[in-house]
Each structure stands twice: as C-alpha cells, then as structure tokens.
C-alpha cells in the first residue's frame, strides 16, 4: 500500500501524455488507445495496470467532485478528475499490481455528498487499461462508450407538501418539454392531477393545481411522454416532506409487540402502505413464515399510519417480520420497534419482558448522586472488560455477565458510573469484534455479549442482571447511544421498509446526506423519527433501569430534539446523566458547544482536550504531549468552561 500511495504522488506531479482531440458530442474516445501503464514509469515505480474513470454531470458542475478508490480489501485514496474530454471529465488511476477488483465512490469534497450511495466495483485487466463511463446519479456504468445514454431521466420524485412535487432530473427541461410531463393516480392512470406550474432546473418543482389528500399521498406516479423523451418509464412519486404533517404523526400511540400468555398485540407505523402483513416464524433460522396475518389500520381521529393486529396464544420468543406493500412493491424487514431479535438481526422476536427479570431487578435501587460534578465515569467495552480476566468463567468472558465478575476492579479505580460502549443490536457476525456504532435495532440488546447468542432472550436477562449487579455495588450505568444514523438505510431495512425516505435526511434529489460520516443521517426533525428516539430512551430507562445516556454525535441532532430528550428523560429520572459530542461526522452542526446552555445536558469540551493533548491530526502538540498547549483553555476547562461556552459547570464534561 505504501508503493500504491507513492505512485499516487508521482501521478499527481506527472503530466498526462495525451493528445486532446476534438470529437462530436456522441463520440467518446478511449484513453486506452493512447495510454499504457508503461507511460507512468518514473522514479523506479511501475504501474502494472490503469483504471480510467470518465464522469459526466449534465449540469457540468465538476468542481470539488473526486473519486475515492481502493483495491478490494485494501486502503483507499482520493483522485481528482483532472482531464477533460467530450463526455465530461476523467481520471487515470494507477496500480503497481493488479487486484482482482477495485472499488470506487464518486464524492463531493471530503464526503460532503456521494454521487451514488453504494460501493461499485470494477474488474481490472492485468497489465492493461480498464476504462469505464459513469453518469452522475446512476448506479450502472459501462465499459463501452457506444452504450452511453445521456437522455433525460428522472432520478427521483418526491411529494414534499400536499401541492408540491420535487423532481430530480438529469438535466433541466428544454423549452416545451414541461408540457410532456404528467402526474397520474397509480390506482387509475387515466386520472390526471393537473400541474399548475413548473419551476425548471436540475431540481425542478412542480406545483399541482390542488392539494393531495392524506389518503392519496402514496398513490402518485410521474409520466414522461414517450414522443418527447423517448423510452421513458413511469416514476414513483414518494411521499417525503408531506409526511411531516400532523396528519401522519400519531405521537400518542405505543408501538411494538406487547406479549402476554394469552395474546400479543402488534402495532407498527407505515403511512404509505396499502397492506401490512405480519410474518411469524417457527424459529430464528426458519426461512419461510408459518403464518401470515394482515394488520388492520388503527388510525386515530384525523391521523394516519398506525397498523395493528392481536394474535391469540402465547407467542413469547416467536420470531417475526413485517411485509409492507407500498408504491406497488412489497418490502420485508424486522420490526424497527422490536424489543428482541435473533443473532443476525434478520428477525424480530416477540418477548414478554416481565418473564425475563433476573433476581433483584425489581428491588435493587439505582444509586443516587448528590452532585453531577462529582460523577466519575469509566468507559468500557463489554467484550474487552472481561475477555482476559482469568478468574471469570470461560463461558462468561466478553459478556454482560463477565462484567459482574470483576466489579471490585471498578471500585479500585474510584469511579461512580460505568459508561458502556454501545450495547444496542448492531451489525456484526457472532463472535466478531465490533465497537457497536453500527446500530440495527435500537431497543434490542446486542446478542454478541450474551452467553448464548442463539437465544434471543439471553441478552435481555443478562444485560438486566449486569445492571442489577452494578447498582448493588453502588455504580451507575450510562448507555452510549447512536441515534444519529443506522446500519442500513435500504428499502428492506427496518427504517426503510415502513416509509421510504422518511427516517433519513436526503438532498432535494433524494440522495442520503452524510452528516454522520457513515452514509446516512437520521432525520430527527421529523415527528415520528423524534418520537422513535424519545420512546427508545424511555424503554431503556423503564425496562433496564439505566441511569443516563451518552449521545454519539449529538451535533447531528436538532435542538428541538435535544430539548425533548431532556424533558422526557428528566421526567422519568430527574437525576439522569446526559451528555454528548457537540460535533458531527462531517455534516452541519445543529447542536454545538453553547447550544446546551440552560439545559440539563453536558457536551464534551474539545477546547480542553486539544489544549492538553494536541489536535486530532497531530499537527500541533498540547500541554501533555510537548512544549506548548493553550494554558488559558486548560484553566477555562477546569472551571467548567463558564467563561467559554457554558452557563453552568454541569453543562460540560471533561
């Protein structure tokens, strides 16, 4: 990889040995006809193979767009589109040796935006030049320039209020083309909704002649006239911003699967579905459901989106999924509101939480703390804490129960609270190490830390038992929570299947934003997304008796959400510990340092951190790492940042 990076540096300094030729718009010459890997031999480095990526943006706005490219299984690097041709721009990427496949992503800036959300891969020709043509926003690419199609296409269509459709197209409309666009009812394509005006552009806005009723928001299609646009297909108009209205926000409804010995009540939310089906499975490994039950609409007066079903009999520990049929397509996924799941998170599991209470769960009080400024937190990873602790039984090492075997060590450290790195259900194979910041189901404890990951109830019992043991030892428990993104945002994910595009922030054209640096951002400004976070926090407080929360990338969350969190949590636990990171993974900061003033929540003080240890990229040293350091920042931090960004010392954490 060092040779790969060195060759990149050589390439950036080396002028391309190309002769630019003029060509007709439809004539896209191959760089491979004029370029060979041997042309890049310099300073003892030899490129065995080359990848040429041609890139076309209909709007011709190429500034700051670049390629992130990596050999499959290896490290990545950035490359610029530094050459022009009739297609647009292109980059030449050298490889000292030829990997079987190379992955690439086209991005804007330093992950400000992705051109296409998924990784794409190219098989390289050993000892030769591999050349592909990529059009902005399209997942498919071609190695044959004769197959390039630059005709107008719809990238996305979204109903953002009852009368406005946001339309993302590959180029602005030309004069007269607006008359060839129609909005139709999916159930009756002869029923047309008249377009009043079109605000033209790469992102066009269609104003309809009338409001779309709440019952019809997921029934629209957009049709481009074939005579004008050629072989154009109908496009689904997804309900997006329109779903933020109160008509689609049953905020008082309790969602999830609630089990007793007599029956289980299933309640879920999908304001765009025509049909919601419950799929019950015999066991977590079963591939086909044993029963399929249609849910009924359970809408409150004036509100839509709730679905429910009551199934008789004792379903405790029975796996299930939902099938949501919307926009003419079925989408299956685990229940986003579930309280248990199988080991690989592919199935939700019904549980009666009252049957999974360990000894002492109901009568072990949570430790109180006299002053928040006296709290001393110790951050631990469940697996790491006991994995090499020899007195712990082998079967319990790396588990929730393993923590209970060495509580004396925590007392020796003098800490008052344990901060658990994420224990919510995350995407990882059984036994695979993971930090936990890739959450799948937020109300489910991770089975990897249970003594029996194959038993969906084991993680619940054992996490509760661990918390009881820590409380009995006068230690509080704080959960690290990661509500700023999810492990999957696809159409068959827990948050994608019920309401596509609702739970995630998107650009006007429908691409996921990357506020968190992980490829998606949870849209907590939307009522039901905010409700999900609040209900989830209440679940952990009431069902696990935790004592507080540490919010990963708190800066991604809207101030209204943070205020609602403080209100909900403090109502249940007035002494709860709340703190978080006042920054993001690269997106705009919504809740930064200073936003917490007057609220019962603290934020990390990176001013103090950097003054002591230096900055994150190692370009500057701090007080503890070399000569220097901002002594004033250290003094302000020790004083609780009251002369910096806080109103009270309790609003910062060091």
Tell me what each language-model feature is.
Residues 8-19:
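Bacterial N-terminal signal peptides
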Residues 381-544, 554, 561-573, 577, ...:
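Substrate-binding/active-site clefts of carbohydrate-active enzymes
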Residues 63-73, 166-194, 274-292:
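Short, surface-exposed alpha-helix to beta-strand junction/turn motifs within ectodomains of secreted
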Residues 343-344, 348-355, 566-654:
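Conserved alpha/beta catalytic core and glycan-binding cleft of carbohydrate-active enzymes
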Residues 164, 170, 174-231:
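Acidic, low-complexity Ser/Thr/Gly/Pro-rich repeat segments typical of extracellular/periplasmic
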């Amino acid at each position: 990889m060092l040779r790969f990076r060195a060759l990149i540096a050589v390439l950036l300094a080396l002028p391309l040995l190309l002769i630019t030729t003029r060509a007709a718009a439809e004539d896209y010459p191959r760089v491979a006809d004029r370029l060979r890997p041997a042309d890049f031999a310099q300073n003892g480095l030899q490129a065995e193979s080359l990848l040429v990526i041609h890139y076309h943006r209909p709007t011709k706005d190429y500034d700051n767009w670049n390629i992130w490219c990596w050999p499959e299984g290896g490290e990545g690097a950035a490359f610029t589109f530094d050459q022009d041709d009739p297609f647009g721009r292109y980059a030449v990427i050298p490889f000292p040796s030829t990997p079987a496949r190379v992955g690439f992503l086209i991005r804007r800036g330093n992950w400000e935006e992705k051109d296409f959300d998924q990784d794409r891969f190219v098989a390289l020709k050993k000892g030769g030049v591999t050349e592909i043509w990529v059009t902005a926003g399209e997942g498919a690419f071609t190695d044959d320039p004769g197959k390039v199609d630059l005709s107008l296409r719809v990238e996305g269509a979204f109903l953002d209020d009852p009368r406005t459709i946001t339309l993302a197209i590959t180029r602005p409309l030309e004069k007269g083309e607006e008359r060839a666009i129609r909005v139709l009812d999916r159930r009756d394509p002869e029923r047309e909704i008249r377009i009043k005006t079109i605000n033209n552009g790469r992102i066009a806005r269609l104003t309809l002649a009338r409001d779309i009723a709440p019952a019809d928001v997921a029934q629209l299609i957009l049709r481009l006239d074939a005579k004008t646009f050629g072989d154009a297909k109908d496009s689904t108009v997804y309900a997006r911003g329109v779903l933020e209205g109160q008509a689609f926000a049953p905020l008082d409804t309790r969602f999830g699967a609630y089990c007793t010995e007599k029956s289980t009540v299933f309640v879920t939310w999908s304001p765009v579905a025509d049909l919601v089906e419950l799929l019950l499975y015999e066991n977590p490994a079963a591939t086909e459901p044993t029963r399929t039950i249609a849910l009924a609409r359970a809408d409150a007066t004036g509100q839509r989106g709730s679905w429910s079903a009551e199934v008789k009999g004792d379903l405790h520990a029975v796996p299930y999924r939902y099938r949501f049929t919307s926009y003419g397509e079925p989408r299956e996924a685990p229940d986003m509101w579930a309280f248990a799941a199988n080991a690989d998170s592919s199935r939700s599991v019904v549980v009666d939480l009252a049957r999974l209470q360990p000894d002492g769960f109901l009568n072990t009080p949570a430790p109180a703390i006299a002053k928040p400024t006296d709290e001393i937190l110790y951050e631990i990873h469940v697996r790491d804490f006991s994995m090499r602790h020899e007195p712990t039984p082998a079967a319990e090492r790396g588990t929730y129960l393993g923590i209970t075997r060495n509580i004396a060590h925590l007392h020796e450290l003098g800490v008052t609270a344990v901060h658990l790195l994420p224990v919510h259900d995350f995407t990882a194979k059984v036994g695979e190490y993971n930090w936990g910041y890739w959450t799948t189901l937020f109300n489910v404890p991770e089975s990897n830390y249970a003594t029996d990951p194959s038993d969906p109830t084991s993680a619940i019992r054992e996490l509760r038992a661990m918390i009881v043991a820590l409380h009995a030892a006068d230690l509080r428990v704080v959960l690290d929570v990661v509500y700023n993104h999810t492990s999957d945002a696809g159409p068959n994910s827990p948050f994608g299947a019920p309401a596509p595009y609702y739970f995630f922030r998107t650009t006007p054209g429908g691409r996921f934003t990357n506020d968190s640096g992980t490829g998606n951002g949870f849209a907590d400004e939307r009522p039901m997304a905010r409700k999900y976070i609040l209900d989830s926090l209440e679940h952990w407080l009431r069902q696990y008796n935790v004592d507080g929360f540490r919010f990963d990338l708190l800066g991604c969350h809207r101030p209204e959400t943070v205020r609602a969190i403080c209100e909900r949590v403090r109502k249940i636990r007035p002494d709860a510990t709340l703190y978080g990171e006042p920054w993001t993974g690269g997106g705009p900061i919504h809740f930064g340092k200073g936003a917490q003033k007057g609220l019962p929540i603290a934020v990390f003080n990176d001013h103090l951190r950097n003054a002591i240890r230096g900055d994150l990229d190692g370009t500057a040293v701090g007080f503890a790492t070399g000569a220097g350091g901002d002594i004033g920042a250290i003094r302000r931090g020790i004083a609780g940042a009251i002369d910096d960004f806080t109103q009270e010392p309790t609003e910062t954490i060091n």
